[in-house]
């Protein structure tokens, strides 16, 4: 496969009557979209966009994960346009800047974005000509919705129009513009082609981990390339996709839909694991569960898998069908991953970036290695550039999934694409079997005055093991304004329920005692020298990544 039209058509041919999406339309009311119907609706919407003059144009999409979001994105691709997915958490000024920088001429939007979209249309600063709601009913007359467009497209196809089928797709032309995380003015715009993303989908399909019998719950935002490409994988594999009613309803949704797989960030699994661990603690079952884990693991080595039966109660709490979780976008807690695997839910970690469409490496269900992000997926090469005495260096990659560059920023493109290799900006090492391990971002490394390097992610992993930790970050905070002599500083967000009746000073002393234990097993130069404790959540991106620079600014400015 080279393009999305081929992918969608092949899925309709292979899985025609199978359900591609199940949509909730009220309490106890559901509507199924088959693969055949999905293809028909993509063709109809794509035809309507061409008829309105948007063939090959840049069109933005903003809103929560939904079937209509997928439909709009697929139609834009199939009509040869350029999709510009935007983060629904953007402030108005950031949203406006994204519209201006990407030069989109139309936008699909969700109900919650209506005010910002109307304001942007009226500003005169963008090139927007049309705004199409992803909600509403056909023919209400006030606005042309996605449903109105589909209706028009159906009529055009019925009357013999075939623009959507006859259009030649250049798979190597820019088809998606994605903003990297960071402040909007500093973010780069990644240019991906249909070939880039389809090549990545094909590589993941060759891992043979998703099947037509699977039900996927779409958790990662579609504007994030991990979530977006993950959805294309589900469509290529013939799986069914459902949508979450909100994270507090996640486990009930698992049971409601019989969810068997999802793509997510470690925070989701770690939250689930903490609930399981809390239940085990309350029932005084620690020793019993530990023994059962050892027992099940031992039989597993003999290729006898009894995990789902031994831990049936945990499986039931996860809906009864959960078998696979694909994790990415952040480092995962090794103990959490090991425990979930023991409970019968295989958690595999992947690694990649927006610029790589995104997946570069992944564990395989039969090749798990604690702490690693697996081996390169088929079609991808990876290596360590200029490794130090510990084998740590920058991770480089090449393959058909690598972006063609940053939009409007040739200098930044030349910085990362050198001699056919993409410089990820991540530091890591590779073991003798080709498994990769991430030690941190180059830009996050704390360089001490003595020249020693502290990788904050390593310390954060240790701190995250403490039972009351909600989230934490380790930063190099300038000592009295001296950037060349940073203090290794921990900021920790704690669970208030864990310290009921304690004063702030008492909480600090308890945390400090635990951190000192971590320091005792850490080389002197790596030790945490300053601690900040708070119950206030940190500033994060919509995918749950802590905005390190903004947190550092708060500390330097004395806001903590």
What would you call each of these model-derived segments?
Residues 16-19, 133, 155-179, 186, ...:
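Conserved pre-ATP/AMP-binding loop-to-beta segment of ANL
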Residues 17, 21-53, 57-66, 70-74, ...:
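Conserved AMP-binding/adenylate-forming core of the ANL superfamily
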Residues 32-36, 175-201:
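Conserved AMP-binding A3 loop
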Residues 78-152, 496:
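Structural core segment of the AMP-binding/adenylate-forming
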Residues 90, 107, 399, 404-405, ...:
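AMP-binding/adenylate-forming catalytic core of the ANL superfamily
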Residues 262, 306-436, 442-445, 470:
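Conserved AMP-binding/adenylate-forming
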């Amino acid at each position: 496969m080279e393009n999305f039209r081929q992918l969608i058509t092949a899925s309709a041919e292979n899985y025609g009557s199978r359900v591609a999406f199940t949509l909730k339309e009220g309490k106890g009311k559901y509507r199924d979209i088959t693969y055949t119907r999905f293809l028909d609706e993509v063709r109809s919407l794509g035809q309507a966009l061409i008829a309105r003059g948007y063939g090959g144009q840049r069109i933005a999409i903003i809103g929560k994960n939904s079937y209509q979001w997928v439909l709009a994105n697929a139609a834009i691709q199939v009509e040869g346009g350029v999709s510009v997915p935007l983060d629904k958490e953007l402030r108005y000024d950031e949203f406006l800047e994204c519209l201006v920088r990407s030069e989109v001429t139309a936008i699909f939007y969700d109900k919650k974005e209506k005010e910002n979209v109307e304001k942007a249309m009226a500003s005169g600063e963008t090139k927007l000509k049309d705004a199409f709601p992803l909600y509403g009913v056909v023919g209400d007359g006030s606005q042309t919705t996605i449903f109105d467009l589909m209706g028009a497209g159906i009529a055009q196809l019925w009357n013999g129009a075939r623009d959507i089928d006859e259009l030649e797709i250049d798979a190597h032309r820019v088809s998606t513009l994605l903003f990297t995380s960071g402040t909007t003015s500093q973010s780069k715009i990644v240019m991906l082609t249909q070939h880039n993303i389809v090549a990545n989908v094909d590589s993941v399909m060759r891992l043979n981990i998703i099947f037509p019998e699977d039900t996927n719950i779409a958790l990662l935002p579609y504007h994030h390339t991990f979530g977006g490409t993950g959805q294309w994988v589900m469509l290529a594999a013939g799986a069914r996709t459902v949508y979450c009613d909100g994270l507090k309803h996640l486990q009930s949704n698992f049971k409601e839909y019989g969810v068997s797989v999802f793509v997510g960030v470690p925070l989701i699994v770690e939250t689930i694991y903490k609930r399981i661990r809390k239940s085990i603690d309350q029932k005084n079952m620690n020793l019993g569960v530990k023994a059962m884990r050892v027992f099940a693991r031992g039989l597993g080595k003999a290729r006898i898998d009894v995990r789902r039966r031994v831990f049936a109660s945990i499986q039931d709490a996860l809906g009864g069908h959960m078998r696979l979780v694909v994790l990415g976008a952040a480092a995962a807690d090794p103990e959490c991953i090991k425990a979930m695997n023991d409970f019968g839910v295989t958690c595999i970690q992947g690694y990649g970036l927006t610029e790589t469409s995104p997946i570069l490496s992944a564990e395989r269900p039969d090749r798990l290695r604690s702490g690693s992000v697996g081996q390169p997926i088929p079609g991808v090469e990876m290596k360590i550039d200029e490794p130090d005495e510990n084998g740590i260096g920058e991770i480089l990659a090449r393959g058909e999934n690598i972006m063609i560059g940053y939009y409007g920023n040739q200098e930044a493109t030349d910085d990362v694409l050198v001699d056919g290799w993409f410089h990820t900006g991540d530091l890591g090492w590779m073991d003798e079997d080709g498994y990769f391990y991430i030690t941190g971002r180059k830009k996050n490394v704390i360089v001490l005055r003595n020249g020693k390097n502290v990788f904050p992610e390593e310390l954060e992993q240790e701190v995250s093991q403490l039972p009351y930790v909600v989230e934490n970050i380790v930063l190099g905070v300038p000592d009295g304004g001296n950037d060349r002599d940073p203090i290794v500083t921990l900021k920790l967000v704690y669970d208030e329920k864990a310290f009921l009746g304690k004063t702030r000073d008492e909480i600090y002393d308890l945390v400090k005692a635990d951190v000192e234990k971590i320091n005792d097993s850490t080389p002197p130069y790596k030790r945490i020298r300053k601690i900040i404790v708070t119950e206030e959540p940190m500033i994060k991106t919509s995918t749950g990544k802590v905005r390190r620079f903004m947190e550092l600014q708060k500390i330097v400015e004395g806001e903590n």
